[in-house]
Design a protein with these regions (language model features):
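A subset of solvent-exposed loop/turn segments in beta-rich extracellular surface proteins, enriched
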Residues: 3-35, 84-88
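Exposed, low-structure sequence patches enriched in small/polar residues
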Residues: 35-75, 80-295
Length: 295
């Protein structure tokens, strides 16, 4: 199949043509987006073998990608471990195991002799009133995968390790409390982050739903990340911490089968480095209409 990609040719005397990046947005609105349309030919083939024994399931997966044009990333330091070439192999072994109210799952993946990725998780129903989840992930800085859909903070699964823990409690009828904590680390540089970094993400939400028509929830979220200092113009910028806090309260009320009223109030605080916090708020009212489908 043909895929969208950024085509690069050095000059009119240089016949070498290569791909600097893949385009996954699917848009062809501008000249540059249209120029990226279907320039790379990709051949993908692979397979899966699964084995189930009582409550245990194990699977072996393999896939290979071949490209008509080589992929060559830019010389930026964060691209040091990026995929280059015309062929990429991915193999993995996954498992899942269920015992009563406990479910364990995970996968170990690799590409070639270097890049490795590991994920292990647990889902536990403590009682009829509480559920817990725990997930650990490790993706090496040189792991590459084109179509992975992993539980990661980054948009692409690479150069990350982290631990996620969540809990959902239903203390009384019509009330639910959800909370999670996610702590992550990036051992190598990232785009706009010129140093190894770490961060965290916390959330607490309380929901009240007395019936099918009414739902009210209040949510507090706090996130800390590292980014380059935007005011520093050195080749390798120093990094600073960015902290974002958000508090949202929302009311959803179903007026009828086709009409829903929604009201939201949201407050935000953003702090970067040693500077003072920036504040903002949002108030909006929506009236959602879902038309009746005609036969």
């Amino acid at each position: 199949r043909k895929t969208d990609a950024n085509l690069v040719q050095q000059d009119s005397l240089d016949t070498e043509t290569y791909i600097s990046s893949f385009q996954t947005s699917g848009y062809h609105r501008t000249y540059s987006e249209s120029a990226d349309k279907a320039v790379q030919q990709q051949l993908s083939f692979g397979g899966n073998i699964s084995y189930r024994f009582k409550k245990l399931q194990v699977g072996f997966n393999a896939i290979q990608y071949r490209f008509s044009l080589p992929v060559i990333k830019g010389a930026d330091p964060y691209n040091r471990y990026a995929f280059t070439g015309k062929k990429l192999n991915n193999i993995s072994i996954d498992y899942s195991f269920t015992y009563r109210n406990l479910h364990l799952f995970g996968e170990f993946a690799g590409n070639g002799l270097h890049g490795k990725a590991l994920i292990n998780g647990m889902l536990l129903s403590v009682s009829a009133l509480a559920d817990m989840s725990l997930l650990y992930r490790y993706i090496s800085r040189d792991y590459q995968s084109l179509n992975a859909n992993a539980f990661t903070e980054s948009a692409t699964p690479k150069n990350e390790s982290g631990l996620f823990a969540g809990i959902s409690i239903r203390p009384v009828t019509n009330w639910q409390i959800d909370a999670y904590a996610d702590i992550f680390h990036f051992p190598w540089l990232k785009y706009l982050v010129d140093a190894p970094s770490r961060g965290s993400d916390y959330l607490l939400q309380v929901t009240y739903k007395p019936n099918r028509q009414l739902e009210i929830y209040s949510r507090y979220k706090r996130e800390t990340k590292i980014s380059n200092d935007a005011d520093d113009f050195q080749m390798i910028s120093p990094v600073i911490a960015s902290k974002r806090k958000n508090w949202r309260t929302q009311v959803n009320f179903k007026l009828s089968k086709h009409l829903t009223y929604r009201n939201r109030i949201e407050l935000s605080w953003f702090t970067q480095g040693a500077g003072g916090p920036s504040r903002g708020f949002l108030v909006n009212v929506d009236l959602l209409y879902k038309p009746m489908l005609q036969p």
